Amino acid sequence: MFIFILGIAVLSCDPKPSQECIDLSSEISKVKNNIELYSMVWDKAINGRNIEIINLDNFDENIKAITADGDIVGIDAFKAYYNNYLTGFSDAEFNIVDVFGQGDKVVKHWNFKGTHDGDFFGIPATGKKIDLIGTTLVLMKGGKIVQEQDFFDNYSLLSQLGLTPTE
């Protein structure tokens, strides 16, 4: 009898997924694609030293980097801003420690290492090695990066560069 009832229950189930399941699957796929694109772009830009990856294929034309000194807006300005990391650190190494997302938002925890052997935002080479950790909040739309805001310990960066006052 139990097998008969179980058989009726199974046969009466709708094998078609609910709209809620379809929407959830679509959302998971979007987040996964955003994370993959974002990770690929920054690996190529910094580790691959290919600043030209910052282009209209991967970034919104009005890409914005929110900084303490004011927003950096547009592909060319954004590219020039991040190129400072390549000119300042010829051995730059960028690793994403962790990354996760929800909807159009991505959060990455990162590590940046390198030897300061070139001009870095107007700071002449110090020859010092840095090992910096930080977090970036990212907004994506339509499979493109729209906005970024980096958070890291500026005092730690300046200390590692030997640019803080000694006590």
Where are the predicted features?
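Short beta-strand edge/turn micro-motifs at domain boundaries
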Residues: D131-S159
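Exposed beta-sheet edge and beta->alpha loop/turn motif
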Residues: K113-G142
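Bacterial N-terminal signal peptides
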Residues: M1-A9
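Solvent-exposed loop/turn segments at secondary-structure junctions
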Residues: G70-I72, G114-T115, F152-S156
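A solvent-exposed, acidic/Ser-Thr-rich amphipathic alpha-helical stretch
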Residues: I51-G103
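A short hydrophobic beta-strand element
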Residues: D104-H116
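Short, low-complexity N-terminal intrinsically disordered segments enriched in polar/charged residues
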Residues: C13-D57, T166-E167
